[in-house]
Amino acid sequence: MEVERSKKDDDLNNGSKSNEEEEISVERIFEESNEIPPPWQKQLTFRALIVSFILAILFTFVVMKLNLTTGIIPSLNISAGLLGFFFVKSWTKILNKAGFLKQPFTRQENTVIQTCVVASSGIAFSGGFGSYLFGMSDVVAKQSAEANTPLNIKNPHLGWMIGFLFVVSFLGLFSVVPLRKIMIVDFKLTYPSGTATAHLINSFHTPQGAKLAKKQVRALGKFFSFSFLWGFFQWFFATGDGCGFANFPTFGLKAYENKFYFDFSATYVGVGMICPYLINVSLLIGAILSWGVMWPLIGAQKGKWYAADLSSTSLHGLQGYRVFIAIAMILGDGLYNFIKVLGRTVFGLYKQFKNKDVLPINDHTSTAPVTISYDDKRRTELFLKDRIPSWFAVTGYVVLAIVSIITVPHIFHQLKWYHILIMYIIAPVLAFCNAYGCGLTDWSLASTYGKLAIFTIGAWAGASNGGVLAGLAACGVMMNIVSTASDLMQDFKTGYMTLASPRSMFLSQAIGTAMGCVISPCVFWLFYKAFPDFGQPGTAYPAPYALVYRNMSILGVEGFSALPKHCLMLCYIFFAAAVIVNGIRDALGPKWARFIPLPMAMAIPFYLGGYFTIDMCLGSLILFIWRKLNKPKADAYSSAVASGLICGEGIWTLPSSILALAGVKAPICMKFLSMASNNKVDAFLNPS
């Protein structure tokens, strides 16, 4: 998620073209087919909410699995829109044949479904189940020698997780509602992902688009079935740790020891097909640099740089270098992009207010005529028709803030009411900055704002007052506000271009958020209870960012004294390198920047290893060859095929979790041994 929330699919963005460039008016096409947008109450249909709920569960399992394995989560907007179209279209077709169809399926209803599903599954990310929230647990605390006292530990429980999410997840929705007209109509911000999703939904509801959508759904279904059955087949051979296809030493046992192998994950092959080539190559370069060069060299200093008798998971040993150097690169990349996007935001606002002709508050008219397309006129007219009153947004924010200020300190005693009050005072400004920056660059910095809260609130609370837990809880409060704010504005852009009412979009986002506040904790709880080694390094679900976030909080509270020898110097070097590499990328421009790796992507395998990068690079290779052989077909179907691969294996986690809870284990352990180890096993089993 750290990568994919920031770096969107290049193909998705390339499809985000402004309506001024369109030769044919989209809205005239729909008017010729006698489509009249229904009132906002009829856009929020019962069938739309039922389909949204089903898809929300599906996508939450997918996002949760990705969150707890590597933390890399691709955009699922296309999948949500496509499956929403398929389910409701099938529903209406059956009812129409039976003579019970009361309302046709519209693009506005399709937009409502997509918004609700993405809002719900988004809680699996912003809820921190793979980062700050699970980082509070004793499972993660035991992996660090510092701050693992009861004051800095809070184990997951369904009750407080659901309650916490309900009191912090809705404020972001109210914080930017009054600014929707300024952002969408006056500033005409692009919101590339929202625009691309709108183009997709509009295309579904044309005759040619409907035919293509059916073929895409068919392709998605085929690869969903393959991925699900492949996950089921693999389960039979993985009865214990180190068993199964996921531990196949593809490049030899030495490479396997250094985390270089193909683990036969259909999910990450699909993720690789969606992620841009540059991200996948950056991940591979990071894996080679760390596990191929750095860690073997630092490991050779065992007994000199760190004690030789430390366990492999001790942060005072080699694991400390892996975790803290990765943190340094993530912080360097995050700080650079925070300053860059903030600078663009301030400069963009300066230009907007300097050129007052674009603002409706100006009484003077421009001498130069401004050409407004028919589509823009029609969309603006309907977008401004169903207003959401500013008093409603302000009242909602204040009431929810008061409830949160009272409630959250009862959940986290270390986080005081005045900490939350200060965050809620500055949060609307940060939410606006994030929403505006996202509109310009498609770049959400929600996790960066969360890290700022970790350091500031954690240091303010202090080590003796549970500052580590306070920092992690503050991260959750801040992340949920700024993340939902930018998501809502993206959805407003989608609604603007599909003629969906802002009221139906707001309510859909709110309903989806409420669904996510229940579904995500329940799905996480299933993982947490089903797998005894959950959260441990080297297991099926290591939750890598949980340890990263906890150690960020420890650094903010206790400083650098706990780092192993020379680790701080290496952290400084890689922090600076991340800033410099980003600076070089921006200085060279897009033409050459595509050949320079992304520091954020390089940092992820520093801690995890290179096994998932092999899967993702294979996905890129498949897409590259497919495009060479048949580019139009690849562009039309690659997202559907990738989504099928991701969702199929993701959904297999539900039955596998239920089997684990029931105590049912796989019958076979398939392991790979060296010749020497195999001879020892044979001698033990067959003594002569």
Swiss-Prot record:
GO terms for molecular function: oligopeptide transmembrane transporter activity. Disulfide bonds: none annotated. It comes from the Eukaryota. InterPro entries: OPT, YSL-like. Residues 1-11 have a biased composition (Basic and acidic residues). Keywords: Membrane, Transmembrane, Transmembrane helix, Transport. The keyword Transport applies. Residues 1-26 are annotated as: Disordered. It is a multi-pass membrane protein. The keyword Transferase does not apply. It is found in: Membrane. One of its GO terms (cellular component) is membrane. The chain crosses the membrane at residues 48-68, 71-91, 116-136, 158-178, 219-239, 278-298, 323-343, 392-412, 420-440, 452-472, 506-526, 560-580, 606-626, 644-664. Belongs to the YSL (TC 2.A.67.2) family. May be involved in the transport of nicotianamine-chelated metals. This is Probable metal-nicotianamine transporter YSL7. The gene is YSL7.
